[in-house]
């Protein structure tokens, strides 16, 4: 053993345990493990001031696109943060808040619902909106996906397959190859943003 420690240092302990069939990671260690936390986000400075309804539409579009990013990367989240900046004319303090979902998911249906709920909780209905930033916090591998009592796992799996198919179509034929009804509403920005790369028009 002394020779192994001289040759391999602290790794020698792992080699010795392995040789004797010992598992150095205990059940307690596994239960105590917490995956590394990350986040993904999206931000828009709007071309003109939006009213409450228009701002809510923008937030939902952003949530939908971030959900596709989760699916693409095999990730899930249980926390959403929203920042809304008002028109510069108002000199009004920005609105911001965070909502924690009872599930860990990449479901666009669920996440857009909670994004809308958060938007309605924190945003002044009478103040024109100029900037929206949305972030998904505590983003982890989809192996940590969790359901609540009101979730049908089969339905979530069907939605996940649809989202994955949508992503593949967009990758192959362009981001505007498949759209949702909200993307065609007045004030929606997804189509225009999809035509841009790094904030500049892509020439499509």
Model regions and ranges:
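DNA-contacting surface of Y-family translesion DNA polymerases
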Residues: 1-128
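Acidic, metal-coordinating catalytic segment for phosphate/diphosphate chemistry
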Residues: 97, 101-204
């Amino acid at each position: 053993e002394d020779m192994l420690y001289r040759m391999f240092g602290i790794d020698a302990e792992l080699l010795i345990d392995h040789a004797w069939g010992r598992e150095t990671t205990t059940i307690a260690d596994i239960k105590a493990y917490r995956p590394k936390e990350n986040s993904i986000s999206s931000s828009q400075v709007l071309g003109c001031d939006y009213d409450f309804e228009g701002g809510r539409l923008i937030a939902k579009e952003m949530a939908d696109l971030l959900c596709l990013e989760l699916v693409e990367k095999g990730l899930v989240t249980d926390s959403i943060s929203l920042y809304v900046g008002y028109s510069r004319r108002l000199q009004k303090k920005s609105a911001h808040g965070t909502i924690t979902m009872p599930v860990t998911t990449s479901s666009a249906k669920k996440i857009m619902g909670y994004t809308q709920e958060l938007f309605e909780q924190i945003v002044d209905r009478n103040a024109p909106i100029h900037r929206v930033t949305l972030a998904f916090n505590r983003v982890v591998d989809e192996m940590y996906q969790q359901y609540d009592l009101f979730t049908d796992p089969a339905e979530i799996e069907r939605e996940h397959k649809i989202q994955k198919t949508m992503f593949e179509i967009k990758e192959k034929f362009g981001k505007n190859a498949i759209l949702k009804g909200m993307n065609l509403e007045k004030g929606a920005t997804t189509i225009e943003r999809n035509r841009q790369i790094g904030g500049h028009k892509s020439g499509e």
